[in-house]
Amino acid sequence: MAASRRLMKELEEIRKCGMKNFRNIRVDEANLLTWQGLIVPDNPPYDKGAFRIEINFPAEYPFKPPKITFKTKIYHPNIDEKGQVCLPVISAENWKPATKTDQVIQSLIALVNDPQPEHPLRADLAEEYSKDRKKFCKNAEEFTKKYGEKRPVD
């Protein structure tokens, strides 16, 4: 139950502070271990859409890290076709129980805004990003327009 108490507090903080890049947060009050929300990137080529993510917290949270899955398809070297993301802050070896969910979300937004081709989950996209940025951006922008969700209007 410690996980639920902490998650309730973290959710309250996030809602109170109003993160402009993480919106439309949905949490089932009966199950605080699953959150959904929209990532709203600032940087091209992802600034034309929003991306729904799901955050799954283990029952052992905060002693074990959450898992993040993209529910919206995204053309990104660090996010695979199944929506799994390579995010160092939530890897088992880097995870620290003091890390809060808003920090995890900020790291995720930073990664989406600024891909890390040196740690790819999709080598083909990492190569395209590194060798032909213009082509990558064109493909990613088209993909975002096709699959991305509507950005929330303030």
From Swiss-Prot:
Q: What class of enzyme is it?
A: transferase
One Pfam family per UniProt: UQ_con
- Domain (UBC core) ranges: 2-149
**Domain of life of the organism in this record?**
Eukaryota
What are the GO BP annotations of this UniProt entry?
cell cycle phase transition; cell population proliferation; cellular response to glucocorticoid stimulus; cellular response to steroid hormone stimulus; protein K11-linked ubiquitination; protein polyubiquitination; protein ubiquitination; regulation of DNA-templated transcription
Could you name the active-site residues? Answer: C86
Q: Kinase: present as a keyword of the record?
A: no
Q: Which UniProt keywords are given for this protein, alphabetically ordered?
A: Acetylation, ATP-binding, Cytoplasm, Nucleotide-binding, Nucleus, Transcription, Transcription regulation, Transferase, Ubl conjugation, Ubl conjugation pathway
Where N6-acetyllysine occurs, the residues are K131
Gene Ontology molecular functions: ATP binding; transcription coactivator activity; ubiquitin conjugating enzyme activity; ubiquitin-protein transferase activity
Catalytic activity, reaction form: S-ubiquitinyl-[E1 ubiquitin-activating enzyme]-L-cysteine + [E2 ubiquitin-conjugating enzyme]-L-cysteine = [E1 ubiquitin-activating enzyme]-L-cysteine + S-ubiquitinyl-[E2 ubiquitin-conjugating enzyme]-L-cysteine
Q: How is it modified after translation?
A: Ubiquitinated. The alteration of UBE2L3 protein levels during the S-phase of the cell cycle is due to ubiquitin-dependent proteasomal degradation. Autoubiquitinated in vitro.
Q: In which pathway does it act?
A: Protein modification; protein ubiquitination
Places the protein is found: Nucleus; Cytoplasm
Q: What is its EC number?
A: 2.3.2.23
Q: Name one GO cellular component term.
A: nucleus
Q: Which family does it belong to?
A: Belongs to the ubiquitin-conjugating enzyme family.
Q: What is known of its domains?
A: In contrast to other ubiquitin-conjugating enzymes E2, residues essential for lysine reactivity are absent: Pro and a His residues are present instead of an Asp and an Asp residues in positions 88 and 119, respectively.
Complexes and interactors: Interacts with PRKN; involved in ubiquitination and degradation of misfolded proteins. Interacts with UBE3A. Interacts with CCNB1IP1, CBL, ZAP70, RNF19A, RNF19B and RNF144B. Interacts with ARIH1. Interacts with ARIH2 (via RING-type 1). Interacts with NCOA1; they functionally interact to regulate progesterone receptor transcriptional activity. Interacts with NDFIP1 (via N-terminus); the interaction mediates recruitment of UBE2L3 to ITCH and causes MAP3K7 ubiquitination.
Please give the function described in this protein's UniProt entry. Answer: Ubiquitin-conjugating enzyme E2 that specifically acts with HECT-type and RBR family E3 ubiquitin-protein ligases. Does not function with most RING-containing E3 ubiquitin-protein ligases because it lacks intrinsic E3-independent reactivity with lysine: in contrast, it has activity with the RBR family E3 enzymes, such as PRKN, RNF31 and ARIH1, that function like RING-HECT hybrids. Accepts ubiquitin from the E1 complex and catalyzes its covalent attachment to other proteins. Mediates ubiquitination by the CUL9-RBX1 complex. In vitro catalyzes 'Lys-11'-linked polyubiquitination.
Give the protein's recorded name. Ubiquitin-conjugating enzyme E2 L3
- Origin organism is Pongo abelii (Sumatran orangutan)
